Amino acid sequence: METWEVIASVKEATKGLDLSLDHPLIIKSEDVPSNILQLLQQKNRRQLKHICMKSRKEYFLLEEYGPGFWVKWPYNYFNGYSLPERRTEVVTTVERERAKRETLKTWDELKFKELLHLWSEEPKGSCKLEKDKDLKLDMNPPDMKGESKINDYYSDPKEYIESKYYDALFSIHTPLAYFVKSNLVRLKNTCRTKYGSDSYKIAYQAMLQKFLLSIVQFKDRHDNRLLLEPFSSPIADEKRKNCLTKFVIQDENKNSSTIADLCVVLKSREIKLQILLLLEIIGLNDLDWNFRDFEKKYKLKLKKRSLNLTKKGLVRRRSKKKTSEKDKGIERITTSLDYCEQLDLYLDRACILDILLSSETPNPDAIEASNGTIQEHKKNILDKSKEASLVGFINYVLIPYFNKKVPHAVEFIIQKLKGPSMRPKRALKKVNDSTNVSSPNTVETYNRLSTSQRASRSSIINSVPSSPALRRVDANLFSRKSIASPTPELLNSRTNSNLNEFLESETRSLKRPSQLGRTKSDLTMNHLQKRQFSVSDLSTTRVPNSSTITLKTPFSHSTINAYKTMNNSFRRVGKRKDINETIRLHERVDSEENVQVQATPAVKKRTVTPNKKAQLQSIIESPLNFKDDDTHEGRKNTSNITSTPTNKPPENSSKRRVRRRLFAPEST
């Protein structure tokens, strides 16, 4: 009698079971022993797969498919190590997941027996992939033809930089930024890997120097159109042929306009490539500091270069000595290549080429159908927003990739390509800190002054105008230095014009306006500010007075004269009042103590002498100068005084010139 035994129950059939997936068998529940069937139909075993043994000879896997049917998967080879470590743990701990079961009617309708062949697994899919057979991922579009270009892999860094240099030269549609950020970086990493981190810079610089061209070599290459000739290197010659094939240029036809435009484009690109190589070498050798004062360090070389470029005479007096090829080779070897000067020469070449292209007149009739791309790239050289132009070369290549490495060289290139500026340089404003620190002599002199003199000094300080021309005064605070007028003789002349005040307020550099004459116009009133000189300076006569006070200070070259109020007439300043002429309340001077026009220095009140009273009798009092506290006799006397000049004949008034005062002192 055959005996069944359940060895283990697993949730998933692993690859290590080694089942025979080609020959599954379907058995009914009646064929399974009753004790085994009750064990398999427990709640915690319904979703599991059961590893069973029959008569200790046959091993198979039972899996329930619907009510009343089981699928039997035989073993190819049974390995006891493939079973779980604890056979009972799998059965007891795994719980059945609650799910909706299909009814018997649903399973009968599906007829899953017919679908068993679709559920079979392929044994190849379960096997591990061999190491030799790697998957090849093909990401090409389905409609793409098999003409995709495969990038060449160069293990040798010399071949790599040669390929990328001529690729950047002849591929005019490729931006030069890729040559810096991709090709040069990859070359440096390749040299570091091959030659080590200690000596890779020497090999890296030697490879870059191989593609540096002197000015003579550059001139021979582009003047003779050697780029269109076959190269000795197969890599460079392949790049040249691809460029000519792309623009449908034949080697026989070398005089067409297409080739001429292509030569100009290639010349512009190689100048920029040479600049990039030079900047990389300058950064490796730490030569960036030479560009801080390039003109001073290379003064002799620049002067020698300018002498070599001077034009010679048409008739040569002496025959030129012929030099052999050996001598030329010796000269080239002996002359060392200065990278900084070489960079300056290439920048000159770039500026000259840019000027020639900008001055060239375009001919639209000469443009051929196949010449559109070259013509478009030639126009981009003059377009500042494109990378092909000099400005775009600075913005898109030099500044992003070389500004941190060689900042002074980049600044020198920017100034060189920008050209000389026609604007005058602004003079730097020198800030004098001496105004903030007062000397001890100034403080002592101020303390020695009396109270009235200090008040007069403070009024002078507060009357400084807001005009910028008049603000240019000395550093001292207590001296008043009037600016000399260009025409001092006009100050004492009798005129009704305001030109004197206008000239007084300006600097010495201001010339006398020749078109302004004697006029009563108020056009110059806008330029007038508060008075910076005494009222008596405008009088026609100077009367010396014994009561003149002379103050000599160490911070003033001129003598400060404080005159007493005399019988000289006041002069009207103007009709308008400036905003800056407002006086603070605590700085106003009482009219009973002092008589002055606005911003005139205050004078201490003096006792009135009999002679002074006699002088005051001739003053015509202003009708607006009445006081409320005056006595009746004072008003009567003033009325008599005002009536006396009107009764005089005009002959007497013509002998003496009397001007009207704005404010008259009180006669006490």
Curated annotation (Swiss-Prot):
Extent of Basic and acidic residues compositional bias: 626-636
Additional information: Present with 125 molecules/cell in log phase SD medium.
Example of a GO biological process term: DNA replication initiation
A single Gene Ontology CC term: chromatin
Annotated source species: Saccharomyces cerevisiae (strain ATCC 204508 / S288c) (Baker's yeast)
Subcellular location: Nucleus
Any GO molecular function: chromatin binding
Amino acid composition bias (Polar residues), ranges on this chain: 433-450, 637-652
Entry keyword Cell cycle: yes
Protein name per Swiss-Prot or TrEMBL: DNA replication regulator SLD3
Statement: the UniProt record of this protein carries the keyword Transmembrane helix: no
Primary gene name: SLD3
